[in-house]
Amino acid sequence: MFFRRILLLSFLLTPLLLLSEPGEAGSFFDNDRYFLTMRSLGDAKCASPADKVIARFFREKNPKLPRETAKKYSQIVVEAAREFGVDPFLVAGIIVKESTVRANAESRGCYGLMQIKWSAHKKSIPKAFPSIRSVKDLQKPENNIRVGAYMLANFLRRNQGRVDASLDRYKGSPSTKYKSTLLKYYHRMISLYHKEKTS
């Protein structure tokens, strides 16, 4: 009877143990087929219509954002993504999640579109970007997006390309909700991207 209970218990617990394997539980981008397909495109995903898609998505999430500003930001996102080898839709998603596309956003010492914590990076940012020497410099949209894309690229490199772990680093702590929201944003942009490509 005792052994039968142990056997039954192990049978019931096995699926739970399998779910807790690294890379399975809480996996968002690393196993998402849409993200992996876009990743396989390399720099091609930075070509048109990526900028149009991002501009449209920015205005969906922030209707008060002027059309020209959305267009300008989207072009900077695509250029920064190409420069640092990251996914432009991932960068755009971070911008929406972190600041709702507001260049003057400020929260708990984090600044700008990509909510970069100046106190944590005030030594490393000027080394990589000599023209950025203050919070005022960091808040300029082009600077902020380039620094954010650069940081994301560094986190990806340190985490062997694992996006979920890199997003945890970007946020500063593991967050299922953060990654889940970003993946939802990503899927929306991919949907817009395919519509643009086929129209």
Regions found by a protein language model. Give the residues of each.
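Bacterial N-terminal signal peptides that target proteins for export
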Residues: 1-8
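Bacterial N-terminal signal peptides
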Residues: 9-17
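Sec/Tat signal peptide C-region and signal peptidase I cleavage site
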Residues: 17-25
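Catalytic glycan-binding domains that act on GlcNAc-containing polysaccharides
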Residues: 27-199
